[in-house]
């Protein structure tokens, strides 16, 4: 028999979905702080914690984000998820490559020349993604809806300029948070279906499904 905590966690994982239709009702400060504090529990290489979060609350701040990322009136008029723009909170997770290069130049790591070739994959983005996932799961546990979405390359400069993001930090996307209306249409992508376990898990040796 599963322990109560395990059952509750499985329920959070099962209920986790991308919400695209939000009420404009504000998120209580203590609830938002819980989401952000849990993000700090994310693992990071060398305990670098090379992530940061730009938090935009309320219509005045969120409108500034949409004005530089979704300023085409024609696109807005035909947008399939207009109530996405009603989300009362946007969190932009940012990663710092330099923080990792500096951390691994310290004596206990010994990569003193700060060479990028030491890194087989960009752990600064991966670790920030871990933090983002903890926010998504905490949102479910707190009764909120959440959506992780990308910021197109052509909009990054505008986001940096609008909110004063330092060059050392790279936005990896954005998270919309708020109370779900319960009325969003499912993404057409879901028609693809979820892959079965045997299609993605290779035990002991790579094998074709």
Role assignments for model-derived ranges:
Residues 1-6, 123:
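Short, Lys/Arg-enriched N-terminal segments with co-localized hydrophobic residues
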Residues 4-5, 9-19, 172-209:
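C-terminal helix-cap and adjacent tail motif
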Residues 40-47:
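Glycine-rich phosphate/pyrophosphate-binding beta-alpha loops
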């Amino acid at each position: 028999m599963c322990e109560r905590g395990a059952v509750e966690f499985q329920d959070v994982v099962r209920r986790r979905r991308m919400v695209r239709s939000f009420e404009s009702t504000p998120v209580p400060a203590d609830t938002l702080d819980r989401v952000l504090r849990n993000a700090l529990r994310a693992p990071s290489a060398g305990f670098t914690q090379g992530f940061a979060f730009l938090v935009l609350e309320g219509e005045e701040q969120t409108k500034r984000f949409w004005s530089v990322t979704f300023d085409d009136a024609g696109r807005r008029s035909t947008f399939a998820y207009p109530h996405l723009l009603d989300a009362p909170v946007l969190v932009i997770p940012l990663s710092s490559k330099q923080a990792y290069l500096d951390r691994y130049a310290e004596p206990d790591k010994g990569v003193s020349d700060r060479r990028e070739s030491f890194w087989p994959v960009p752990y600064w983005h991966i670790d920030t993604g871990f933090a983002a996932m903890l926010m998504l799961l905490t949102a479910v546990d707190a009764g909120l809806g959440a959506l992780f979405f990308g910021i197109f390359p052509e909009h990054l400069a505008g986001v940096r300029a609008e909110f004063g993001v330092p060059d050392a930090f790279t936005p990896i996307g954005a998270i919309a948070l708020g109370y779900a209306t319960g009325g969003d249409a499912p993404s057409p992508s879901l028609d693809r279906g979820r892959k079965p376990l045997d299609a993605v898990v290779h035990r002991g040796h790579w094998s074709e499904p």
